[in-house]
Amino acid sequence: MLKLLQQYEYKIIYKRMLYTCFILFIYILGTNISIVSYNDMQVKHESFFKIAISNMGGDVNTLNIFTLGLGPWLTSMIILMLISYRNMDKYMKQTSLEKHYKERILTLILSVIQSYFVIHEYVSKERVHQDNIYLTILILVTGTMLLVWLADKNSRYGIAGPMPIVMVSIIKSMMHQKMEYIDASHIVIALLIILVIITLFILLFIELVEVRIPYIDLMNVSATNMKSYLSWKVNPAGSITLMMSISAFVFLKSGIHFILSMFNKSISDDMPMLTFDSPVGISVYLVIQMLLGYFLSRFLINTKQKSKDFLKSGNYFSGVKPGKDTERYLNYQARRVCWFGLALVTVIIGIPLYFTLFVPHLSTEIYFSVQLIVLVYISINIAETIRTYLYFDKYKPFLNQYW
């Protein structure tokens, strides 16, 4: 084992794995530091909302220092992405320090709003009146900023940024779910299992399949057997869209509650129109999922920059003029790819959610299946990241000559 670790081609990946494990150890330790005892928490029947929080690294079963998870940070990234979408050139010219400060300041503001909402919705009224609510908010905000810092450090020195934290949070949430006796026939149960397996295969298809757009490369005109192409994934945004859409939905609910509570202290915490027990709440979430997924995918593809790169290099698409025509052609192709991928993901997530409205006695099992699907999707992305680091091994014969 020691000899294996000493080989350079594996050294980077092992260092990153160890760093990620250390980050996860701190995260697990933090989730076990309770601010309020379990007996002082309100019992909520909206189980999927708790599951949604866990998909951002949070936990509302107990009020701990990492209860908010990465939700405020993901929401701040969404807001900044939408602001910069209209002028990507200006965004690309910003320094890392400028982006960092904007993200952190916005995360701080959103953390305060979401902390206020979580305390009033999940902590008993007696405990809220007894404790210093501002001190509790300060602890939650501090824990959130610490978790954001850990996720940022993992992006630089670990593997897959915030995804391992979210994956551990989902696993923890799945283990805490109480699976009661299933009041359904064996045919229905078998059908659910088959649907989950089919869904996982579709997600694997979405993640691994890519769309290739051939173009003429002026540097390789002599190589007739080598074709140049521009490749995009069917869902360019990947699993980060699921976390961001849940974060935006949670912030929407907490933001509306925060504003209404300023004018009416006796406002209901439940807001049934924005829950997953309501078709309106599910529809709002799916619309957010599609819109954010589309904007994030277009942001990552960045067709405007791609058209500029083609204009500078002299490469072109057959039958398409350079410049504005190339940009319009790429925009058309990008819209087709993004909407197709997002439609598949939205249908996969949406059908089980709507299904719980018709068979509420199977809601726990359906939510468990949805969480399993999200877990597999995130695991695929983490595996892709690890495989990228392992590509170094393929160049060993060449690099050893110069090392």
Curated annotation (Swiss-Prot):
The chain crosses the membrane at residues 17-37, 63-83, 105-125, 131-151, 157-177, 186-206, 240-260, 276-296, 339-359, 366-386. InterPro entries: SecY/SEC61-alpha (IPR002208), SecY2 (IPR014269), SecY_dom_sf (IPR023201). It is found in: Cell membrane. One of its GO terms (biological process) is SRP-dependent cotranslational protein targeting to membrane, translocation. Signal peptide: none annotated. Gene3D superfamilies: SecY subunit domain. Keywords: Cell membrane, Membrane, Protein transport, Translocation, Transmembrane, Transmembrane helix, Transport. Its main location: membrane. Disruption phenotype: No effect on cell growth, significantly reduces export of the cell wall protein SraP. The small amount that is exported seems to be glycosylated normally. A double secG/secY2 mutant enters stationary phase earlier and has significant differences in the export pattern of a number of extracellular proteins (shown in RN4220). Single or double deletions are as virulent as wild-type (shown in RN4220 and SH1000). It comes from the Bacteria. GO terms for molecular function: protein transmembrane transporter activity; signal sequence binding. Pfam families: SecY (PF00344). Belongs to the SecY/SEC61-alpha family. SecY2 subfamily. May form heterotrimers with SecE and SecG subunits (Potential). Component of the accessory SecA2/SecY2 protein translocase complex required to export cell wall protein SrpA. This is Accessory Sec system protein translocase subunit SecY2.
